[in-house]
Amino acid sequence: MPMQGAQRRLLGSLNSTPTATPNLGLAANHTGAPCLEVSIPDGLFLSLGLVSLVENVLVVAAIAKNRNLHSPMYCFICCLALSDLLVSGSNMLEMAVILLLEAGALATRASVVQQLQNTIDVLTCSSMLCSLCFLGAIAVDRYVSIFYALRYHSIVTLPRARRAIAAIWVASVLSSTLFIAYCDHAAVLLCLVVFFLAMLVLMAVLYVHMLARACQHAQGITRLHKRQLPAHQGFGLRGAATLTILLGIFFVCWGPFFLHLMLVVLCPQHLTCSCIFKNFKVFLTLIICNTIIDPLIYAFRSQELCRTLKEVLLCSW
């Protein structure tokens, strides 16, 4: 992971030392003040990762199987599932290696563990960046489909979507490699925080604008058919609730992780920040939960994809 809180977990396991970050937990040790630390059992963490892994593999398999789903929109959804798959898979791999090292079942040199740590860090960081990028790409795709409906198929073509997807993957891998190489620099962590905020603002602006357009369309229909106003108000409330849930899940699942990064830059030695740093595994767990929720929001609401998914499951038996 691209921050001090997880960089040395594998090496710490190899040396049989605590895997906490330097300076973490010092507030409680020096002052005796209570410090809230939520413990996530390793079994629960691995179980959530496995659920995410299976769920996203099914999404990728269903989209790959059905040629009717080979449209730009489903390409973005497939890549989101693939990046979420890598997020959960890389975290599960790291946790599994840590447990094997702590149990003494895996014996290796420190240099090999360091190389493995760097590889997992790059994989995790790049998959996280890809996941955020494809969430933004899906929002842009839906925005174009609503506001430029007549020209959508000429604007969002499959070749353009493929080029955008390739650019996202390449940029994510290159940038994550640089982030891991220079993870000790505050500017690197700030860049990640700014990137998250940019994605949050982009999604909020696009989805709010889409909701406003949908409400205007519903209002026009009610005027045309001379229906009562409460029907339109009910539509607006449902749309606002859906938007709140969508953005709320995104913020709750990703926000604490990037808050952690920001606090590493702003107050690495502060006692209160140290208490927050001790819950780093909780923040990773929230991201894993987001990779479980993403298919429910973006993939499984499609009847075509669900039918294909049933076929995939039947063929696998």
From Swiss-Prot:
Keywords: Cell membrane, G-protein coupled receptor, Glycoprotein, Lipoprotein, Membrane, Palmitate, Receptor, Transducer, Transmembrane, Transmembrane helix
Membrane topology: Multi-pass membrane protein
Glycan-linked positions: N29
Lipidation (S-palmitoyl cysteine): C315
Entry's Gene Ontology BP terms: adenylate cyclase-activating G protein-coupled receptor signaling pathway
Membrane-spanning segments: 38-63, 73-93, 119-140, 164-183, 192-211, 241-266, 280-300
Entry keyword Ribonucleoprotein: no
Gene3D superfamilies for the chain: Rhodopsin 7-helix transmembrane proteins
Extracellular side, ranges: 1-37, 94-118, 184-191, 267-279
Ranges of the Cytoplasmic topological domain: 64-72, 141-163, 212-240, 301-317
A GO cellular-component term linked to this record: plasma membrane
Record's subcellular location: Cell membrane
SUPFAM superfamilies (alphabetical): Family A G protein-coupled receptor-like (SSF81321)
A GO MF term: melanocyte-stimulating hormone receptor activity
Chief localization: membrane
Domain of life: Eukaryota
Similarity comment text for this entry: Belongs to the G-protein coupled receptor 1 family.
PANTHER family: G-PROTEIN COUPLED RECEPTOR (PTHR22750)
Subunit architecture: Interacts with MGRN1, but does not undergo MGRN1-mediated ubiquitination; this interaction competes with GNAS-binding and thus inhibits agonist-induced cAMP production. Interacts with OPN3; the interaction results in a decrease in MC1R-mediated cAMP signaling and ultimately a decrease in melanin production in melanocytes.
Function according to Swiss-Prot or TrEMBL: Receptor for MSH (alpha, beta and gamma) and ACTH. The activity of this receptor is mediated by G proteins which activate adenylate cyclase. Mediates melanogenesis, the production of eumelanin (black/brown) and phaeomelanin (red/yellow), via regulation of cAMP signaling in melanocytes.
Name of the protein in question: Melanocyte-stimulating hormone receptor
Species for this entry: Alouatta sara
Gene (UniProt): MC1R
